[in-house]
Amino acid sequence: MRFVDEYRAPEQVMQLIEHLRERASHLSYTAERPLRIMEVCGGHTHAIFKFGLDQLLPENVEFIHGPGCPVCVLPMGRIDTCVEIASHPEVIFCTFGDAMRVPGKQGSLLQAKARGADVRIVYSPMDALKLAQENPTRKVVFFGLGFETTMPTTAITLQQAKARDVQNFYFFCQHITLIPTLRSLLEQPDNGIDAFLAPGHVSMVIGTDAYNFIASDFHRPLVVAGFEPLDLLQGVVMLVQQKIAAHSKVENQYRRVVPDAGNLLAQQAIADVFCVNGDSEWRGLGVIESSGVHLTPDYQRFDAEAHFRPAPQQVCDDPRARCGEVLTGKCKPHQCPLFGNTCNPQTAFGALMVSSEGACAAWYQYRQQESEA
């Protein structure tokens, strides 16, 4: 397949691995204290495990997993609010498939559906808007979540709902922004992060300039990378080269997709519909300043929380779970005492095991047999 196979060619992968090993031999990092590269994107995490890239790295270079999966950082209280809204008999509650099994204290949306709530999986917010137009006597609520990657499609859908004057369409907002989260990670003492592989999809929207503070303020190199083996390995080589040269700058490996300025039309749609300045709670990480998203005044009438006025939900994470440590790269999934036992894909305890982009789900799928051995 053109534009895919060439980025997975085994011969080129092995050549790049050999080049990486040669370059890494010049690093001051050791097997005991390797160069820790945080891959921020859940798509990167799954690609790394699927293709076994973590096992091909030199012993003095290591991947650590970051909070790049928006479903994985859904607070339990927000799921409980979703369940409460979905339980209204006049509501059709729409969301993406990944969110269906995320557990809250009052159960998941899938369990709410089993109890009789009208909860439906959609593939796009436009599908939810179409449902609203087809069911004028029902109240259709779209549960929007994700980083800047999915915000433009939500914004355009709300623009369409406003233009068409759809009165029975509502939006429950759980969009969050990536940049404040990276800053919050780096402000933690002893964060152990030496470099970043930044997500291609988010960067396609926000561009590369948004990351400059990581190099200038925190002196960490960052490379925006694609999702195929050669993309990721080339990104690692670029980071190793920066470390050898004692440089800290932002580089773009994924130039075939990501312009440095990002997608200006997408940014305009986001700015029209969303205020990107509120605080937001992240599961396992607490409240992160300025990472939340709210509707602008012109779109307030679509706000599901303002319309249904659900009771505020504050649910503490179980102290046995190490979700927050996995999300910040401080431990590996299999080091959590619940991993593979209480928490598995069939009976997930945490969202990291539920989402198709979660680090725990990836580890369970691709590394579980090794952990048991």
From Swiss-Prot:
Gene3D superfamilies, A to Z: 6.10.20.100, HypD, alpha/beta domain 2
Pfam families named among the record's database cross-references: HypD
Annotated phenotype, changing residue 69 to A: Can no longer coordinate CN(-1) and CO. Reduces iron content
One GO BP annotation of this record: protein-containing complex assembly
Cofactor(s) named in the record: [4Fe-4S] cluster
Family annotation (InterPro entries): Hyd_form_HypD (IPR002780), HypD_1 (IPR042243), HypD_2_sf (IPR042244)
Binding site residues for Fe cation: 41, 69, 72
Keyword line: 4Fe-4S, Iron, Iron-sulfur, Metal-binding
Domain of life: Bacteria
Pathway per the UniProt entry: Protein modification; [NiFe] hydrogenase maturation
MF (Gene Ontology): 4 iron, 4 sulfur cluster binding; ATP hydrolysis activity; carbon monoxide binding; iron ion binding
Family membership: Belongs to the HypD family.
Record remark on domains: In addition to the iron-sulfur cluster, contains two additional oxygen-labile iron ions.
Quaternary data: Monomer. Interacts with HypC. Forms a complex with HypC, or HybG, and HypE.
Role, per record: Involved in the maturation of [NiFe] hydrogenases. Involved in the biosynthesis of the Fe(CN)(2)CO cofactor. HypD may act as a scaffold on which the Fe(CN)(2)CO cofactor is formed. In complex with HypC, accepts the cyanide ligand generated by HypF and HypE, and also coordinates the carbon monoxide ligand. Required for the formation of all three hydrogenase isoenzymes.
Name of protein: Hydrogenase maturation factor HypD
Gene: hypD
